[in-house]
UniProtKB/Swiss-Prot annotation:
Keyword terms: Cytoplasm, Methyltransferase, rRNA processing, S-adenosyl-L-methionine, Transferase
Name of the protein described by the UniProt record: Ribosomal RNA small subunit methyltransferase G
Stated role: Specifically methylates the N7 position of guanine in position 527 of 16S rRNA.
Family: Belongs to the methyltransferase superfamily. RNA methyltransferase RsmG family.
Gene: rsmG
Location in the cell: Cytoplasm
Transmembrane segments: none
Top-level lineage group: Bacteria
The EC number(s) this enzyme carries: 2.1.1.170
Catalytic reaction list: guanosine(527) in 16S rRNA + S-adenosyl-L-methionine = N(7)-methylguanosine(527) in 16S rRNA + S-adenosyl-L-homocysteine
Source organism: Burkholderia cenocepacia (strain ATCC BAA-245 / DSM 16553 / LMG 16656 / NCTC 13227 / J2315 / CF5610) (Burkholderia cepacia (strain J2315))
Amino acid sequence: MTARRAPAVNRDVLEQMLVEGTAALDLTLTDAQRNQLLDYVALLGKWNAVYNLTAIRDPKQMLIQHILDSLSIVPHLRGRTSARVLDVGSGGGLPGIVLAIVEPGWQVTLNDIVQKKSAFQTQMRAELKLVNLSVVTGRVESLQPGVEVPEKFDMIVSRAFADLSDFVKLARHLVAPGGSIWAMKGVHPDDEIARLPEGSHVKQTIRLAVPMLDAERHLFEVAVDDAN
């Protein structure tokens, strides 16, 4: 039995979708940034069979469900010309690679426990020439500032890592003073919020509108007392 091939899609079609999507999000990208994002989609599709990065194989759906979904959080994270960002459970590099492309002033670190996914992330750093991107393999709860990572982070993000309460428990020791944990979720996770550990609380809840995606999406900013 042969693997099902992804449908071929003209790059111009994807570029037009990206232009329309970023306009809907009120984001302005340079030509170079658009090309990097389109190259990333192509590379994600090319290496997906080897690294098992995503169940989505249609390039159009990759653009919508991965790129535009990741871009939808950018307006809410902006406000810093420089920031240290950790993407936990990054997998194929989402949202971290997208953040590194559109915010070159940020230092973005991708984290995953699976070595082959870290290998793909490292390859993307080289192919997309992302000098502001780094990769660290290992369990987030085992990462120590000054050892596995240089220092604590202003923003710790996750797109599909874990239950919100578990995410906070595992990553809170890496939040810099004044920093926050940012979790991307689908439907509003009332039960997960109710189980947030002591010394943490939801600072803001944002209903995301992802262009061309008819699905409920939320972004949660969680503050932790440890970071004060």
